[in-house]
């Protein structure tokens, strides 16, 4: 019987999702147990007025000391095989500050080239993402914000790092911080609204199934792919790490 070969990115995605199992479980546990402080009514009122719902750093601080959660995620990275026991211990006793790692994530610090420091940053991001996802879910558990028209996330004010192509001409944007999603009909740069080449450059990466979409005018980039077949956004971002590194090497930002 003839068989259909799956695209390489489909196989890579499913394999990585399986390998990331311990990390995804740690993320789900943090998401379920955390209790971020959010004035839900006030946040909803702000969003209706076109303003960002809450102060993300204040919400993170309301969740207490991030170190125990960070240690749990590092444990998960070790179980998953991304980190040795010695490196995990070294990171836990290093001078790296979890709050600084999260703040760097907020302000667009470059992804570390060193693999161990990159895992440390990823672990801090997993924690921060879980806490902000929980906060955003309190405001609106619906999947997609359909009436939001700004570039930044309606909930936490983060910029999108992923764009999912929908049927037709629209795209769904995904917040790099809290994974909230909102629609846009615009096909070019979200910042300067340019749509034409060569200002807009698109590089396809068949191995991961993403296009790296770069604006040479304002220096922003997005990772874009069809919506179908996506995994957890933690897995999606891990899959596309090399695209982030390539964009950052060019001096671009999300």
Residue spans for each PLM region:
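N-terminal alpha-helical interaction blocks
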Residues: 2-140
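Cys/His-clustered metal-coordination modules, chiefly Zn-binding fingers
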Residues: 136-251
